[in-house]
């Protein structure tokens, strides 16, 4: 059985920092919550392809591939998270999609979670899962 995901999200990472973004909120009040770049999976599109496309559209970033971190639930839907290393600065992004981007370490993401400033609430868990995957790959 094929799992149907609503969105594909991506953790860009470098050393001990992870990229989060504040998405535009035209349809509701701006609550300035930080989340992962990504978005809707189009009809007929593989989730990993959607993740790569969303990186190009939102951050003007091209990565050769992504690794799957796992599925996460938000508002009664499943969302799949991928990850890719990124070592360059991101100086520009689509300001029709995103308000702000920033690199955060795990402690800062934990603070955002305690302040209820994470979009879906599971971003920290996704980062921690990625760290375990990276650690296992090194062993």
Regions found by a protein language model. Give the residues of each.
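Conserved Nudix-box catalytic region and its N-terminal flanking loop in Nudix hydrolases
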Residues: 17-53, 57
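Conserved N-terminal beta-strand and adjoining loop/helix that marks the start
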Residues: 1-20, 40
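A generic fold-level signal
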Residues: 3-5, 13, 29, 76, ...
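Unchanged
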Residues: 40-122
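Short secondary-structure boundary/capping segments
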Residues: 2, 10-11, 26, 71-72, ...
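Residue-level signal for short segments within beta-strands and strand-turn junctions
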Residues: 12-14, 22, 85-86, 105
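Charged phosphate-binding loop/patch that engages nucleotide di/tri-phosphates or the phosphate backbone
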Residues: 118-139
């Amino acid at each position: 059985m094929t799992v149907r995901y609503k969105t594909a999200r991506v953790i860009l990472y470098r050393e001990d920092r992870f990229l989060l973004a504040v998405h535009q909120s035209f349809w509701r009040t701006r609550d300035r919550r930080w989340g992962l770049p990504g978005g809707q999976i189009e009809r007929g599109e593989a989730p990993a392809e959607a993740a790569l496309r969303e990186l190009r559209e939102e951050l003007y970033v091209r990565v050769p591939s992504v690794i799957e971190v796992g599925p996460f639930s938000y508002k009664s839907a499943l969302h799949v998270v991928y990850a890719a290393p990124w070592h360059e600065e991101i100086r520009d992004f689509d300001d029709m999609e995103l308000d702000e981007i920033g690199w955060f370490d795990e402690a800062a993401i934990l603070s955002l979670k305690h302040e209820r400033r994470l979009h879906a609430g599971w971003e920290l868990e996704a980062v921690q899962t990625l760290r375990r995957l990276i650690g296992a790959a090194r062993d």
